[in-house]
UniProtKB/Swiss-Prot annotation:
SUPFAM superfamilies: 1-deoxy-D-xylulose-5-phosphate reductoisomerase, C-terminal domain, Glyceraldehyde-3-phosphate dehydrogenase-like, C-terminal domain, NAD(P)-binding Rossmann-fold domains. Mn(2+) binds at residues 155, 157, 227. One of its GO terms (biological process) is isopentenyl diphosphate biosynthetic process, methylerythritol 4-phosphate pathway involved in terpenoid biosynthetic process. This is 1-deoxy-D-xylulose 5-phosphate reductoisomerase. It catalyses: 2-C-methyl-D-erythritol 4-phosphate + NADP(+) = 1-deoxy-D-xylulose 5-phosphate + NADPH + H(+). It comes from Xanthomonas campestris pv. campestris (strain ATCC 33913 / DSM 3586 / NCPPB 528 / LMG 568 / P 25).
Length: 396
């Protein structure tokens, strides 16, 4: 990107933590970045406040019932921002000339349609929505390749691998990639100690500032399992070439080991603004607001193997990747339902992997060659998991 060209950025999921980080970086570079489209699910007041601050051309509220509040709020603020509502508006704006870059930060399967629309339109796609790759990885990467869209991952682990691989023309010389995991707030606990974990404890992540769903996924290690599946799609690697190490300091974000014996790692403070700055300016580097890494002050870097007995979600994700087809979509949908039930206090922490495993073993995998097949598998997995919630034997 030349210094004179203005990159118009759509931030989908603008009111979430990733959206806030993206807008922070964008605001630091008004000469080269502009937030042209902002979207939110139902937080209309927060979206209006962001519109006043960033003055986008378009604002979208996913909940159509809130459209009048958005429209009237924009008018009352004296803004020329055009109001839209619903998923179809998101898809249309993702594909339109209102933006050339899309930050896909809508949590869950709800973000899939607009992500695919951006890919099909050949946009630069800053992908923070894990579920798009887990649910429809083959479809998304195929769509992006056909349209010439550029997918730049935003989560720290895949951004690290992206940066290591792009630093040299050596993608075919990769022996393995190693994703690092903080281990979450319950690292070191035995399985029996996890039964009494509360939602408040699970969302208190030791290193990263994240939303509640992804915080729980980090606590169960499902987050890392989803990232294994993501890495498979993003970098074309089989599961056997993707490893996971627990690294509690969260300073080494991932490593790439090459066939010549060398290993490249990307290090930095745990702050999403770094990876967003990489995606927004690549191949250039711009200031993100994040300080440098002081290794003397940090002191030490520790690594250990993940405990898949206490945290079986990581193993379940590898199982789903090996099974292929709709299995990852089933895994993801079951997990979304289970985590939601846990956050509402309906089930215990250990019910999350139990429910996911139940659904994964109950439903047969199918081919995943169309979006309809994937959405059907997603819906079927949600129904199966909801039914299983009634059985208290799974809730232990």
């Amino acid at each position: 990107m030349s210094g004179s060209s203005l990159r118009r950025v759509a931030v989908f999921g603008a009111t979430g933590s990733i959206g806030a980080s993206a807008l922070d970086v964008i605001a630091r570079h008004p000469e080269r970045l502009r937030a042209s489209v902002l979207s939110a699910g139902s937080k209309v007041d927060a979206l209006l406040a962001l519109c006043v601050l960033h003055r986008p051309a378009h604002a979208v509220i996913a909940d159509a019932a809130l459209y009048p509040a958005l429209r009237d709020g924009l008018r009352a603020a004296g803004l020329t921002t055009q109001a839209h509502a619903g998923d179809q508006a998101l898809d249309a704006l993702a594909a339109s000339d209102a933006c050339d870059t899309v930050v896909a930060a809508i949590v869950g399967a709800a973000g899939l349609s607009s992500t695919l629309a951006a890919a099909a339109a050949g946009k630069r796609l800053l992908l923070a929505n894990k579920e798009s790759l887990v649910l429809a990885g083959e479809l998304l990467t195929r769509t992006a390749a056909a349209a010439g869209a550029e997918i730049i991952p935003i989560d720290s682990e895949h951004s690290a691998i992206f940066q290591c691989l792009r630093s040299c023309d050596a993608s075919r010389g990769v022996r393995r990639v190693i994703l690092t995991a903080s281990g979450g707030p319950f690292r070191g606990r035995q399985r029996a100690q996890l039964a009494e974990v509360t939602p408040a404890q699970a969302v208190a992540h030791p290193k990263w500032s994240m939303g509640p769903k992804i915080s729980v996924d980090s606590a169960t290690l499902m987050n890392k399992g989803l990232e294994v599946i993501e890495a498979h799609h993003l970098f074309g690697l089989p599961g056997e070439q993707i490893d996971v190490l627990v690294h509690p300091q969260s300073l080494v974000h991932s490593l790439v080991e090459f066939v010549d014996g060398s290993t490249l790692a990307q290090l930095g403070l745990p702050d999403m603004r770094t990876t967003l700055a990489v995606g927004l300016a690549w191949p250039e580097r711009v200031e993100s607001g994040v300080g440098g890494l002081d290794l003397l002050q940090q002191g030490r870097l520790d690594f250990e193997a993940p405990d898949t007995e206490a945290f079986p979600c990581l193993r379940l994700a590898w199982d789903a990747l090996r099974a292929g087809g709709t299995a990852p979509a089933i895994l993801n949908a079951a997990n979304e339902v289970a985590v939601s039930a846990f956050l509402q206090g309906k089930v215990g922490f250990l019910a999350i992997p139990a429910l996911v495993e139940h659904t994964l073993t109950t439903l047969q995998r199918q081919n995943a060659d169309t979006l309809n097949a994937l959405l059907f598998a997603d819906a079927e997995a949600r129904r199966t998991t909801e039914r299983a919630l009634a059985h208290h034997s799974l809730h232990a």
